[in-house]
Amino acid sequence: MIRILDTDFNLQAEIEPIYMEWTRRYYRGDSFTFKVPLNTYITSLNYVIFDNRVGVITKIVSYKDYLQVSGKEYGFSVNKRIVSPSTQTGAAETLQKYYVTANCITPTARKILNLSVESDQGRGTSTTLPARYQDLEELLVEIYQRTGLGWCIEYLSGMFIFTTIEGKDRTSTQNINPRAIFAEEYGNLEEVVVTDSINSYFNVVYMGGQGTGAGRTVEEVGTGTQNNRYELFADAKNLSTTTQIQDKGNEILNEYRETYQLAGTFRSTDSITYETDFFLGDIVTVKHDDYMLDLRLVEVKQIIDTKVTYEFTFGKEPNTINNALNKRLSLINSEVRI
């Protein structure tokens, strides 16, 4: 059952979809799609409430017998925010909440209605993050890639709360938390698909430092040679020392490593249940063929059809065309003169 609200948050209808997918991600906003009867009254920008998640309808397609509705999570996934220039140093959680507050809450004209930020607990490793006109959601993805800290927006009593997620280590080799182990032979993982990709792999980056034209400082970071060399350019005008440029270059190359992912359909068993024994963002152990892999659960797609199923993605952020483009744009962003 989903609830439909108008743009003033008034309840319009409660609907049982013919079919629905709701995808939660550890590193960026949710997305959803569902089908309803053709005579259902529904419009773009209506809000959709499912469990404690709220989405905004951004697209409606009419077919012969039904409407297909899709959208994204309420907040800056829909109402995009571009980050004002700033360089901050601190714990990953502190940086997340600073940039959300500075670009979505404090400025009156840019405020996203009813959005608040939970109290800062200072979780995650410390890092220095220069920001300059990036998409806010992509900046939060960068924080995740550097520190492993995720986020979500929860709906509680009419308020949307930006919340930090810190996944737990539930791998087979640790003894602190209950373990979560997945394998086809255990009956809790089916239809496994493994992806090993170098589509977005680079091992050398040219860091454009201060100066202009022929006088601009350019530092080369990385050691690839000949046919094992994959080059990239990134802007670093806001960095002043060679050490800072080298460190930033290494961070960028870390984001463009070979991508390994494993996806499959989860089946609950007597010994393991989603959101009871493990959660989105946890690092778990996946057994596949002769390998035992420790991977983070980064994406959960809940499918409601004749039954409820879950499709899991373990590993890094998926390398979609949009994600790759957003990464490239963020690297050259400060080249644009405004």
Spans of features found by a protein language model:
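Short, surface-exposed secondary-structure edge patches
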Residues: 35-41, 273-277
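Surface-exposed cap/loop segments at beta↔alpha junctions
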Residues: 37-118
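Amphipathic, non-transmembrane alpha-helical segments in extracytoplasmic/periplasmic proteins
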Residues: 8, 15, 34, 71, ...
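Acidic, small/polar-enriched beta strand-loop surface segments
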Residues: 141, 170-258, 262-296, 305-308, ...
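Short beta-strand-centered interaction patches in the first periplasmic/extracellular domains
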Residues: 61-78, 113-202
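Short beta-strand-centered aromatic/proline hotspots
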Residues: 54-61, 293-302
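Oligomerization/assembly interface segments of phage tail-like spikes and tubes
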Residues: 24-37, 65-77, 207, 256-270, ...
